[in-house]
Amino acid sequence: MSVLDENVPIFKYFEEISKIPHGSFHEEKIADYVESFAKEHNFKYVRDDMNNVIIYKNATPGYENHDTVMLQAHMDMVCEKNKDVDFDFETDALNLYVEDGWLKAKGTTLGADDGFGVSYMLAILSDDTLKHPNLECVFTVQEEVGLLGSINLKKEYFNAKKMIGLDGGGEVSTCTTTSGGRYAYVDKTCA
């Protein structure tokens, strides 16, 4: 039984991916799902050795000469559970429920970071009524453990000069734009 309104594409896709284990370093099954989605919709796509998936959608008529836009979200989630919960993030589906208007997962993290970003892209890709330029939808892996998927992407996969990063943030937002990530390491000798 569905917890969310399946008539709303983003909710439908979020609920579907919540059934697929997708912790960091274990994104194969969700990458399979995204690849199957691309095949089902006859989109050109690339899946690399790390399981990053890039789906390409052609511009709608009248938008062919606009700059290509990249949308990006990561497929892995933070895997945390309550101490009293028996749950295996490599095999078990999340158990979603709504309480007082809030979507939650029983005894575990929800996976909204970045499951909603992934769901947004799938909803955008599946909607043939949206007007848009060429799209490069980038589904990365291993973001939660150091942006490893995005660091290893090959530049020849992309033509976009504009990017919108889709990642959750804050108590009431479901989608924010981000400017990418960067790590800085500092060594300091202490006396």
Descriptions of predicted regions:
Residues 1-2, 14, 18, 39, ...:
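Generic preference for well-ordered secondary structure
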Residues 2-101:
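Acidic/His- and Gly-rich active-site-bordering loop/insert found
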Residues 20, 24, 104-113, 173-174:
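Flexible, glycine/proline-enriched loop segments at strand-loop-helix junctions
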Residues 35-39, 51, 118-121, 144-148, ...:
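Short amphipathic alpha-helical surface micro-motifs
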Residues 41, 56-58, 124, 149-152:
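A generic local structural motif
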Residues 45, 61, 127, 176-178:
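Generic marker of residues within folded, mature protein domains
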Residues 55, 132-191:
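Histidine/acidic-residue-rich, glycine-tolerant segments that coordinate divalent metal ions
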Residues 63-134, 139, 144, 151-161:
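Active-site metal-coordination/substrate-binding segment of hydrolases
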